[in-house]
Amino acid sequence: MKYFVVSDIHSFFGEFKKAIDEAGFDPTDENHRLIICGDLFDRGSQPLELMQHLNEEVPNAILIRGNHEDLFVKMCERGEPWMHDYSNGTAQTIFDFTGVDKPWPFEYRAEVALGMVRPMLNRMVDYYETDHYVFVHGWIPCVKEHHRLAKYRPLEEDWRDAPKNKWEDARWYNGMDCAAQGVVVPGKTVVCGHWHCSYGHWFYENDGKPEFGEGADFSPYYAN
């Protein structure tokens, strides 16, 4: 089996499709498997196209739940957007799914959008594990101490059995910091998304490249 792994598409369907095509992904090849490590929607303008493509062309894709999926569900269940839903692009996703020209109240739009996405949400998992890899969104559940200068340490129990709230927290974690501080899966490589790769190059490689702006390195970061 050959795995094609992407993360944080954020409704940029065109860029996503171009990337997997260039990588050689063939949805008709039974030896090819697509893994998406969360955050399918928000920010870009093509959530509907992305959802239709995954449902129709890649129904066997492995979909891992991200923090933006949590944000989407919580906003839809509230029936109203909060300030962070605008800044994160979640509110706009509702309009992209339901059509900006319809004179519907937001609460009804949210109900319709959630109904559209529910089958995809039901396919999502917290993690996917193979003999050599673990795929997640932020990181595996662990203990986070302090808020600003986060310190991470492993759970005493098996992370695979962590409750729902622990997985929701883990979807926000900086996986590069977690790995550097010893939260690992022995004998396996953890593949994550969520955090910008330029952070790892800037903070851990200390090669003079900035975290953001001109010269930042957004290529995949490989921890030791």
Model-derived features with residue positions:
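N-terminal active-site segment of His-dependent metallophosphoesterases
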Residues: 1-53, 57
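Active-site neighborhood of phospho(di)ester-bond hydrolases with catalytic His/Asp-centered motifs
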Residues: 6-7, 34-38, 63-67, 136, ...
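Short glycine-/acidic-enriched loop or helix-start segments at secondary-structure transitions
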Residues: 16, 46-47, 73-75, 145-146, ...
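Glycine-rich, phosphate-binding/catalytic loops in enzymes
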Residues: 22-23, 50-54, 79-82, 152-153, ...
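Active-site neighborhood of divalent metal-dependent phosphoester bond hydrolases
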Residues: 30, 44-126, 131, 157
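Acidic, His/Gly-enriched loop-helix segments that form or flank divalent-metal centers
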Residues: 95, 100-224
